[in-house]
């Protein structure tokens, strides 16, 4: 009698994806983030579902319904803060996952990488719309500022913004449609994740050396299921410490004030995970230019396969590119800091310099360093 695991039409798919999947024997903990992102997505969908049971998407009651969830619903405070901080954990894992892909040259798997870039855009859109739902001051003004950016599109801009708003300002119609989109998008993300995995399993995983690992594969279970379990433990511990001890550490105090269209907060800023892109947007004085720079700050990832000039896939044996990579990481941290600062001297010039260096490193310096390293390698042989 054959094993049901290998014959049943449905179980067979799970078996080939998570149990008998041939995986390289040398993948490090940087490869844990895929499974952690899956866990984050599950947490967000489950907590979001329970929040949606008590939330009302009406401008007059939205803020009160969130207060009601925290005060009156059984463990409502826990569900709400797990959802809010779960988003932060999601983005931490996302950035580390993308960073790993850049460092080890995973972007050479074109289909997997491009689906990943689409996923990143979709998750960012979902998080933005979710931030609007509590209908606090920063929710309202964040929605107003970000949606208003679309008015920079020539000819159709203003009409497009009013179409998205469902009126002449951010109001009830906007909140209702944002709630609808925020509810449906995680399921679209789940579908995209399946496609992402489908393409990944066509080629198999990359590994730290960037070399072909077909000659040295081990089954995913038990080796990497146990390894992933450690990551799950660390992630859940970090999330629960954040939720139970510092629930408001990453949120804006302004969002505890109900939305008031007549009172603008002194500093309008998005959640911390959008600050780097927000800093790039603000560093360009022209509105359309800023919007294009904002989009390009993420879309640039899709060009990485074409900007790869080295004969080696991974950065592990490429010291010059390694140095540039870590300068890029530091640069992103500077941009994140600048995004949270007011628009005044010296923050404006720091933001502009950081934005220029962000694009320069990716578009010019890294491809040039790849060519230089290849030449040095050729001369040393």
From Swiss-Prot:
This is Cytochrome b. The cytochrome bc1 complex contains 11 subunits: 3 respiratory subunits (MT-CYB, CYC1 and UQCRFS1), 2 core proteins (UQCRC1 and UQCRC2) and 6 low-molecular weight proteins (UQCRH/QCR6, UQCRB/QCR7, UQCRQ/QCR8, UQCR10/QCR9, UQCR11/QCR10 and a cleavage product of UQCRFS1). This cytochrome bc1 complex then forms a dimer. Its cofactor is heme b. It is found in: Mitochondrion inner membrane. The lineage of its organism: Eukaryota, Metazoa, Chordata, Craniata, Vertebrata. Heme b b562 binds at residues 83, 182. GO terms for molecular function: metal ion binding; ubiquinol-cytochrome-c reductase activity. It is a multi-pass membrane protein. A ubiquinone binds at residue 201. The keyword Cytoplasm does not apply. The chain crosses the membrane at residues 33-53, 77-98, 113-133, 178-198, 226-246, 288-308, 320-340, 347-367. The keyword Heme applies. It comes from Chrotomys silaceus (Silver earth rat). Component of the ubiquinol-cytochrome c reductase complex (complex III or cytochrome b-c1 complex) that is part of the mitochondrial respiratory chain. The b-c1 complex mediates electron transfer from ubiquinol to cytochrome c. Contributes to the generation of a proton gradient across the mitochondrial membrane that is then used for ATP synthesis.
């Amino acid at each position: 009698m054959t094993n049901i695991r290998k014959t049943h039409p449905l179980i067979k798919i799970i078996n080939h994806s998570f149990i008998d999947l041939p995986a390289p024997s040398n993948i490090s903990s940087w490869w844990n983030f895929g499974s952690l992102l899956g866990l984050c997505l599950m947490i967000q969908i489950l907590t979001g579902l329970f929040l949606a049971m008590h939330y009302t998407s009406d401008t007059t009651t939205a803020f009160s319904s969130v207060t009601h969830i925290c005060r009156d619903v059984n463990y409502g405070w826990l569900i709400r803060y797990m959802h809010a901080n779960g988003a932060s954990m999601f983005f931490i894992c996302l950035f580390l996952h993308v960073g790993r892909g850049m460092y080890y040259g995973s972007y050479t798997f074109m289909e997997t990488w491009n689906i990943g870039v689409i996923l990143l855009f979709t998750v960012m859109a979902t998080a933005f719309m979710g931030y609007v739902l509590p209908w606090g001051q920063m929710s309202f003004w964040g929605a107003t500022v970000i949606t208003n950016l679309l008015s920079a599109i020539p000819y159709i801009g203003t009409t497009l913004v009013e179409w998205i708003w469902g009126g002449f300002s951010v109001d009830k119609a906007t909140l209702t449609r944002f709630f609808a989109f925020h509810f449906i998008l995680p399921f679209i993300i789940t579908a995209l994740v399946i496609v992402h995995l489908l393409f990944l399993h066509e080629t198999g995983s990359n590994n730290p050396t960037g070399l072909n690992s077909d000659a040295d594969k081990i089954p995913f279970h038990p080796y990497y299921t146990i390894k992933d379990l450690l990551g799950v433990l660390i992630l859940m511990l970090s999330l629960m410490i954040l939720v139970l001890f510092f629930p408001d550490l990453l949120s804006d105090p302004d969002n505890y004030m109900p939305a008031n269209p007549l009172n603008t907060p002194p500093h309008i800023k998005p959640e911390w995970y959008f600050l780097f892109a927000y800093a790039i947007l603000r560093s360009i004085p022209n509105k359309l230019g800023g919007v294009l720079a904002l989009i390009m700050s993420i879309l640039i990832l899709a060009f990485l396969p074409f900007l790869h000039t080295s004969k080696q896939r991974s950065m592990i044996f490429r010291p010059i590119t390694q140095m540039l990579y870590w300068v890029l990481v530091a640069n992103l941290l500077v941009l994140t800091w600048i995004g949270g600062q007011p628009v005044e001297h010296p923050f404006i010039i720091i933001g502009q310099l950081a934005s220029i260096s962000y694009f320069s490193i990716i578009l010019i310096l890294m491809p040039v360093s790849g060519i230089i390293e290849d030449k040095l390698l050729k001369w040393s042989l």
